[in-house]
């Protein structure tokens, strides 16, 4: 018979089990026991402090929550297991509208063989679910905005919103946004014409914008395809990009990121045809007449042939009539005339704009110089004072001369000989201390008669006297000792009123007379013995008193163009200036100077 399993009876192991302990006298010694206890390495083994109950309620609450969570997981596993849904249709796992990623948080805690695994260490078993975007199921009449929400989501998901909008624009209209517009880098640059594309606009706001924008625009072009809306806005006043965006966002209730805005291409025929042909199709709303830049490039008419040819004589005539001789002024102002003048448009389209501007300025100077030489001093003064607008009073000049202790009768006699360029009397000197009004008085006279000012600082150049050949009256302001010495050495004949040889740039020396020359200086040349040969050639008047000013720092005597105009009109006879009616043909008005070819449609 086999041995029974397990241990044997008590008799079997009585040999090795010690039934009684040995007694020792050493352990019975109490003193040694206490000493051994104090030498122990374990301190505070027994806690003798008072006991506290602790937060047992919180522990109980945690245990209850853990138990409830376990019961809830079991209930979900039993009733709502996703594996049961996948078993009904296994092909659902392969259907997905967008790439899916494994969920980082598990909804169901699975158990295997009755042992619950932790959520962090368990391998996930996730089923692929079909995602369908939530669309507002409300009908349109109840304010449903499901389609607009889809457009917003597609825009928000894109990393480059501008590129996304441009791609959608090209897909909708069949043409790139940059093909219709030119780029403005700055948001502060103003322009009257703007191309605006807005994405995902509500239909009601889109329709209302067609009426609201009419009060801001002279021309309006609107079209909407799918989610894209395109506007061509020709505003009544220039606006920058920030102002346009502010207007559109407030009117259409959209964000600024949904807007593309640039000015249109004004000189591109293909772009102009896009807007022109768009008006002929259905679905486009337009308001107002075509802008000029569209009409000129798309509509054929009798003006096209004329606009394509540039007439240089018309440009010269325009500059002559507007008294323009500077190249910069001619170029800028003629370019601004382009919207109104077909010849200016043709000039802008020409490749030789700078060449025409230089030649135009040169021709105007030639005509002005010839016109000046053809006029007498009386006719010149009459012409210039009638170009002055407004009225003044001649007494301001007379009062100022009397304030400076100048005998007005003597000044009037000297001024008469000065204007008529009598020999040895065509040079007047005004001298006195600083701040006495010498330069103000002389400059006001030169300004109204369109004279020239010479500066001795240019005396190192042999052409510094060239302006004397291009004016009727001249001024050298603030003459000092070096200038007096130069005049004493080289300008005696010129001050006498005789012919001199004047060297001009790019020309041979020419024979001419000095015009009436006005001088201002702090030096009384008549008291200087070194310049005794100039005493008989110069008539001097002293201004000893400081120039008077009002309490508001304005001049007490108004030496303006209007004052000189009234002065010449009042003293025309005393200055022995010729009557302009006698110089004309029986008082009849003479025809203005014309340097352009006459037109066939010109009035007789």
Swiss-Prot record:
A single GO cellular-component term on record: host cell nucleus
Region annotated DNA-binding region, chain positions: 144-307
Q: Which UniProt keywords apply?
A: ATP-binding, DNA replication, DNA-binding, Early protein, Helicase, Host nucleus, Hydrolase, Isomerase, Isopeptide bond, Nucleotide-binding, Phosphoprotein, Ubl conjugation
Residue ranges, compositional bias (Polar residues): 587-604
Question: What reaction gets catalysed by this protein?
Answer: Couples ATP hydrolysis with the unwinding of duplex DNA by translocating in the 3'-5' direction; ATP + H2O = ADP + phosphate + H(+)
Q: Name one GO biological process term.
A: DNA replication
Return the SUPFAM superfamilies for the record. Origin of replication-binding domain, RBD-like (SSF55464), P-loop containing nucleoside triphosphate hydrolases (SSF52540)
How it assembles, according to the record, is:
Can form hexamers. Interacts with E2 protein; this interaction increases E1 DNA binding specificity. Interacts with host DNA polymerase subunit POLA2. Interacts with host single stranded DNA-binding protein RPA1. Interacts with host TOP1; this interaction stimulates the enzymatic activity of TOP1.
Which InterPro entries does the UniProt record give? Helicase_SF3_DNA-vir, P-loop_NTPase, PPV_DNA_helicase_E1_C, PPV_DNA_helicase_E1_N, PPV_E1_DBD, PPV_E1_DBD_sf, Rep_E1_papillomaV, Znf_lg_T-Ag_D1_dom_sf
Q: Where does ATP bind?
A: 432-439
Q: What is one Pfam family matched by this protein?
A: PPV_E1_N
UniProt cross-link Glycyl lysine isopeptide (Lys-Gly) (interchain with G-Cter in SUMO), position: 513
* Gene name as annotated: E1
Q: What compartments host this protein?
A: Host nucleus
Q: EC number(s) on record? A: 5.6.2.4
Q: What is this protein called?
A: Replication protein E1
Coordinates of motif Nuclear localization signal in the sequence?
76-78
Q: Give the start-end ranges of region Disordered.
A: 578-604
Of which family is this protein a member? Belongs to the papillomaviridae E1 protein family.
Entry comment on modification after translation:
Phosphorylated. Sumoylated.
